[in-house]
Amino acid sequence: MAKAFENLEIWWVTGAQLLYGGETVKIVDGHSQEMVDGLNASGIIPIKVVYKGTVNSSDEVEAVMKASNNDAKCIGIITWMHTFSPAKMWIKGLQALQKPLLHFHTQYNAEIPWDTMDMDFMNLNQSAHGDIEFGHICTRMRVARKVVCGYWKTEAAQQKIAVWARVAAGVADAHNVRCLMFGMNMNNVAVTDGDRVEFEQRLGYHVDYYPVSSMMDYWKKVTDKEVDELVETYKQEYTIKIDESGEEVYWQKVRNAARAEIALRRVLKDEGATAFTTNFDDLGDADINDPNFAGFDQIPGLASQRLMAEGIGFGAEGDWKTACLYRTLWVIQQGMPTGCSFLEDYTLNFAGDRSSCLQSHMLEVCPLIAVDKPKLEVHFLGIGIRKQQTARLVFTSKVGRGIKATVVDLGNRFRLISQEVECIEPKPMPNLPVASALWVPQPTFEIGAGAWILAGGTHHSAFSYDITEEYWEDFAEMLGLEHVRINKDTTIPQLKQDLRNNEVYYMLNKALR
């Protein structure tokens, strides 16, 4: 079990009623426990499922739902109707529920026992009946949920539950995320800005400004011994490559990057933050030409890269939405093999049906997506208030399918946009000393890039090789977000119509609740 999931639980609640007698309820109880044990033993669902009993009345339903709200370990509820469970008894409980809901339409037995089946068997095994009744009341009440249909022992059904469970963990974590902005948004940039109050109300993330000058108190307390130890870690984890900067400048800048990382880690820990942003125009007020200068000589790119690999959300140029979304993505895909990163659309390569977009940034791309051991290099970065030589990890990404996602503020709502991409191998770029990925947007460059632009997408995104569109669909469902999906089946005319339809729906949506 991934560390991020160790103390989490999913509660399984079975629906029934007392119409069929107490012995029937005992059988339902036994079957339910066996099914929960089977899911836990499968090794597919990464979060422990806990059987919380069979509910037979409105009071019992309401009690377990309220208990789930008040238990921090519980990140979601799975419901299943073994017998018929009249849905009016679920109303108060569903009204009270504040955790994600998965409705599992399954059955204890896989097949009908044709030769022995009688009415007792029919009354006991009424999922076909009870789940439809439960589904109706959820739809009538506009309850957001995921519906999984299939036999509980099959890998296909278990995988869908696993997707939902991972996303529920990400949503639970989102409500505990504090994102620190070291400096504000880059001036005059629209897409990285937005309503931070509504963002917290809708998605749970809390975003605060934190002065770079306050971080300098931490900076000054970092010892040379601590810097030496971290530099030794760099030597073990990365390939040391000294280029035009020369050895003296190289190690000076690497040590400065190490000091920045130590200070930044301590601020985040003391402030209880799991995401942050930087801005190259706000690096503190110290004079870099002062012989006794102490502070950021450039943006803390190496620190950002390493912190992302450990699950700290990051957004460049004050992009707090992407910083928070990256944190959630990292939580969701804990234990998966291939990696995730903050990325930015940088430059295009027109090559017919393999036209692509180079993803990079000035410094901050996560080494989790590196195809080979990253190189630790020092080069000049001529942007922002301090144009200096600075340390960074340089690598190219793995090849393979992936998905990028972003959240944008449209004024009256937040929109989640996801897009399938194919990462391909770039040609050598000997004069570009930054980490990068090269991808072909799906379904084609022309349609995929056009769809992203029409949807109002950002130039920053949270990217993953390991998750799929289904994860982001569940995320949007849990948080009540609009989700625009761009994939192999996307066409521009249909996308335009969907966007127009969504404008109307989301204006009227609040009246339905």
What positions do the PLM features span?
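Cap/lid and interdomain-hinge subdomains that line or gate substrate/regulatory clefts
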Residues: 46-48, 105, 110-245, 249
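Short catalytic helix/loop segments, enriched in acidic residues and glycine
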Residues: 26-42
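Flexible loop/turn segments at secondary-structure boundaries
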Residues: 19-21, 58-59, 85-88, 110-111, ...
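Structural motif
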Residues: 53-67, 157
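A short helix->loop->beta-strand "cap" motif at the edges of active sites that frequently abuts
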Residues: 97-101, 143
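Short, well-structured alpha-helical segments in soluble
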Residues: 61-75, 91-93, 261-270
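Anaerobic metallocofactor- and corrinoid-dependent redox/one-carbon enzyme cores
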Residues: 82, 99, 105, 113-117, ...
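Short beta-strand segments enriched in small/hydrophobic residues
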Residues: 4-27, 176-185
